[in-house]
Amino acid sequence: MALMLVLLFLAAVLPPSLLQDTTDEWDRDLENLSTTKLSVQEEIINKHNQLRRTVSPSGSDLLRVEWDHDAYVNAQKWANRCIYNHSPLQHRTTTLKCGENLFMANYPASWSSVIQDWYDESLDFVFGFGPKKVGVKVGHYTQVVWNSTFLVACGVAECPDQPLKYFYVCHYCPGGNYVGRLYSPYTEGEPCDSCPGNCEDGLCTNSCEYEDNYSNCGDLKKMVSCDDPLLKEGCRASCFCEDKIH
């Protein structure tokens, strides 16, 4: 069975009374949000890792994330197009297929607040069961804390023709939100229980550079060994990353 992704976006709006006489200041703020700046990259990565290590319930197999240049190029290209919808998969693929979170606002929100807004969907989420109410979005949260994601990068653009003219795009590699375990984005347990000897400040460091193309690779591997060329090609993470998080 091929893996299927669930994608969502989020928006934030300030009232008109707070939008007056701020254009020049906001242009400067937008420059300070540029993810070409090392300090901004560090803010984004540190915020993600801080949130990943403080999930509730605690997780045993969440990887530490790092910045990825190729993912940044893809995220910034999509932000620059100002198309307020998710990019096609081929536009967010590096050596891995990447997930995507989107955020739109009528003001230049800080990266930390954008990522926090995604994470705050956890308030409407019950681990293992899903949203507390019908129609509530939780997919941004589950992507932020997806266990096997270990590369992250983001881009931002000003889109003057859009009602919400600030467009934020983050790519997560490999992507999460797979149908089948959408509401279990990580394994519940004590931090790093799944990665003994490969732990840094509560997050695992034994990432896998490959990914599986099928959701049942674990079962297939038990039935047919990785000596089978088709299994080896379609289930590369299961075959080559036995002691790594994937």
Swiss-Prot record:
Signal peptide: 1-19
Subcellular location: Secreted
InterPro entries: Allrgn_V5/Tpx1_CS (IPR018244), CAP_dom (IPR014044), CAP_sf (IPR035940), Crisp-like_dom (IPR042076), CRISP-related (IPR001283), Cysteine_rich_secretory (IPR013871), SCP_CRISP (IPR034117), ShKT_dom (IPR003582)
This protein's record includes keyword Signal: yes
Glycosylation site positions: N32, N147, N213
Description of post-translational modifications: Two major variant protein D and E differ from each other by their carbohydrate side chains.
Keywords attached to this entry: Disulfide bond, Glycoprotein, Secreted, Signal
Disulfide pairings: C192-C199, C195-C204, C208-C241, C217-C235, C226-C239
GO biological process terms held by the UniProt record: sexual reproduction
Main subcellular location: secreted
Start and end residues of each SCP domain: 46-172
Expressed in which tissues: Secreted by the epididymal epithelium and then becomes associated with the sperm surface.
Entry annotated with the keyword Cell division: no
Induction: By androgens.
Gene3D superfamilies reported in the protein's UniProt record: CAP (3.40.33.10), Crisp domain (1.10.10.740)
Domain ShKT: 208-241
Any one cellular-component term (Gene Ontology): specific granule
Annotated family: Belongs to the CRISP family.
PANTHER family (alphabetical): CYSTEINE-RICH SECRETORY PROTEIN-RELATED
Function: This protein is supposed to help spermatozoa undergo functional maturation while they move from the testis to the ductus deferens.
Name of the protein in its database record: Cysteine-rich secretory protein 1
Organism: Rattus norvegicus (Rat)
Lineage, broadest ranks: Eukaryota, Metazoa, Chordata, Craniata, Vertebrata
